Amino acid sequence: MLALEAAQLDGPHLSCLYPEGVFYDLDSCKPFSYPDSDGGLDSTWGWTEAPPAPAIAPYEAFDPATAAFSHSQTVQLCYSHGPNPSTYSPMGTLDPAPSLEAPGPGLQVYPPEDFTSQTLGSLAYAPYPSPVLSEEEDIMLDSPALEVSDSESDEALLAGSEGRGSEAGARKKLRLYQFLLGLLLRGDMRECVWWVEPGAGVFQFSSKHKELLARRWGQQKGNRKRMTYQKLARALRNYAKTGEIRKVKRKLTYQFDSALLPASRHV
């Protein structure tokens, strides 16, 4: 039993004295245990007593064959849906946390692939398709270079170069006026071209067989395209610039330069 002695505060005008007989018994302050509904004492009131030691399970050998592992549980938190959703609110609605293993709506679940066991085979490349050549281009690759072109501009170029004597060292090419003069002197293809005035070098084409003569000239040159009299006539008009052949004012009629004619043909 402890007794609290009276204490007096020092001071000139104030003094306080505890009433006598005020004693506190520590045993009376021991909490009272109320029985619970089952008749036993409530364990929460036995705070002065030491808690019982937990029972320790006996040690068992670990067997990896029988051990089963379970996935870790995802902790779900509750957040408020108010102005500040980052603050915790015990009154908020519990929203399930998204799981990385469960697929979302509309997503397909694909089985896991083992990339380490895959082997890369040889890459198959499709062969580059070779360009398809037309019949004309195929002939162009296999045929030798043409000596004479069928354009009138080339005829004029050849005529000018021959007139200046620039064919030295180069292979001589058959020109149109040489081809026509040879036919007339030999008398070949008389149904296509003939002499009108042999001494003056005037000759005329047949209106009926002029295309046949033009095709013969194209074959002589080795052209791939079909030669026509229209192309041949353009080449003849270009000779007027160099003087080998000029046009006469008659239908389908032309005249050689006198320098090209043999001496027996001069008047």
Curated annotation (Swiss-Prot):
Residues 1-31 are annotated as: TAD1 (Acidic). It comes from the Eukaryota. It is found in: Nucleus. Expressed in the medulla of the thymus, the spleen and germinal centers of the lymph nodes. Expressed in B-cells and T-cells, expression increases during B-cell maturation and decreases during T-cell maturation. InterPro entries: Ets_dom, ETS_fam, WH-like_DNA-bd_sf, WH_DNA-bd_sf. SUPFAM superfamilies: Winged helix' DNA-binding domain. PROSITE patterns: ETS_DOMAIN_1 (PS00345), ETS_DOMAIN_2 (PS00346), ETS_DOMAIN_3 (PS50061). GO terms for molecular function: DNA-binding transcription activator activity, RNA polymerase II-specific; DNA-binding transcription factor activity; RNA polymerase II cis-regulatory region sequence-specific DNA binding. Residues 41-62 are annotated as: TAD2. One of its GO terms (biological process) is immature B cell differentiation. Can form homotypic interactions. Interacts with IRF4/Pip. Interacts with JUN. Interacts with TBP. May also interact with CREBBP and EP300. Interacts with NONO/p54(nrb). The protein contains a weakly acidic N-terminal transactivation domain (TAD) followed by a second TAD rich in proline, serine and threonine. Each of these domains may be required for transcriptional activation of a subset of target genes. Belongs to the ETS family. Sequence specific transcriptional activator which binds to the PU-box, a purine-rich DNA sequence (5'-GAGGAA-3') that can act as a lymphoid-specific enhancer. Promotes development of plasmacytoid dendritic cells (pDCs), also known as type 2 DC precursors (pre-DC2) or natural interferon (IFN)-producing cells. These cells have the capacity to produce large amounts of interferon and block viral replication. Required for B-cell receptor (BCR) signaling, which is necessary for normal B-cell development and antigenic stimulation. This is Transcription factor Spi-B. It comes from Mus musculus. The lineage of its organism: Eukaryota, Metazoa, Chordata, Craniata, Vertebrata.
